[in-house]
A protein has these predicted regions:
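Hydrophobic transmembrane helix bundles of membrane-integrated enzymes that assemble
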Residues: 1-28, 33-137
Length: 137
C-alpha cells in the first residue's frame, strides 16, 4: 500500500507540474528565467548560477517549455526518492505524512522548473543513497 500511495502522489505531482506553468503567476518563475535566458553569457563551472546555466544549456532543458521540464525533472527526483526508500507508514494519514505530501506538491512547483535546487537535490539524494550501504558508511 505504501508503494501504491507513493506512485499515486508522484502521478498527481507530475500532473501539477505540467499544469502549474500555465496557472501560476510569473513571480514563481523569477529564478528560472535568468537561468534559461542567460542574458549575459554567464555559463561556467564556478558558482551556482553559472553552473546551473551550463547544465541546462548542455542538456537542452533550457530550451523546452517549463511544463516539459517538469515532466522530465520530477520523475527523476521521485525515482531517486524511491531508491532511497519509502517509509513503512507512508500510506497512513497523519500530520507527519500530510506534511510530506504537501512538500511533494511544493517540489512540483519549485523543482518542476529550471532551478539550482534540481541539481542540489540530485547530489543530496546520491549522497544519502551511498550512505545507506554499509560499505560507504
Amino acid at each position: 500500500m505504501n508503494k501504491i500511495q507513493f506512485i499515486l502522489i508522484v502521478i498527481i505531482c507530475v500532473l501539477f507540474g505540467l499544469i502549474f506553468p500555465f496557472v501560476l503567476p510569473e513571480r514563481f518563475y523569477a529564478d528560472a528565467r535568468p537561468i534559461v535566458l542567460d542574458l549575459y553569457n554567464e555559463k561556467g563551472l564556478i558558482g551556482s548560477y553559472p553552473f546551473t546555466m551550463l547544465f541546462y544549456w548542455i542538456t537542452g532543458l533550457g530550451k523546452l517549455p517549463f511544463s516539459i521540464v517538469a515532466l522530465i525533472q520530477l520523475p527523476i527526483l521521485f525515482f531517486l526518492l524511491w531508491l532511497i526508500g519509502i517509509p513503512n507508514r507512508f500510506a497512513q494519514i497523519n500530520i507527519k505524512n500530510c506534511l510530506i505530501y504537501l512538500s511533494f506538491l511544493m517540489v512540483s512547483v519549485f523543482i518542476g522548473q529550471p532551478s539550482k535546487e534540481f541539481i542540489t537535490f540530485i547530489f543530496a539524494a546520491i549522497i544519502v543513497y551511498l550512505f545507506q550501504y554499509k560499505y560507504f558508511s
